[in-house]
């Protein structure tokens, strides 16, 4: 499977370079990701349809960590320490990581909406966990239903294999 290999990093980077060099035209990275430049931003469409955006993309010659020169993408980002705006390289592995993390978020968000629709009180989420408030005597049956709801794939990924496990207690534990 392509997404289990480093090859997808290069595919993501190549699609991003193509998109920046051809504004307005969509470029596929694998079967589920599409990159396109519009309104001075590089957009990546996730399987859910949600978009991830990088500001002011440009194609430049970049120096790799091992000293080689190669064509790459830079984007306008804010330094997390100085809060100053600067240009930084956007490499294929970062593009793919954004796709993976964004898609994981979309799966969890869909599950939270399903839980809410089923009448559960979602009080928090922490990374890949959802915290619910249920009556103590309903803990076991609620956990079974919650796992069923959380492992039902969304319409945009009908064949995606989802797994979940759970526990219930009076207090949150890690």
Where are these predicted regions, by residue range?
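Conserved catalytic core of nucleotide polymerization and phosphodiester-bond processing enzymes
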Residues: 1-174
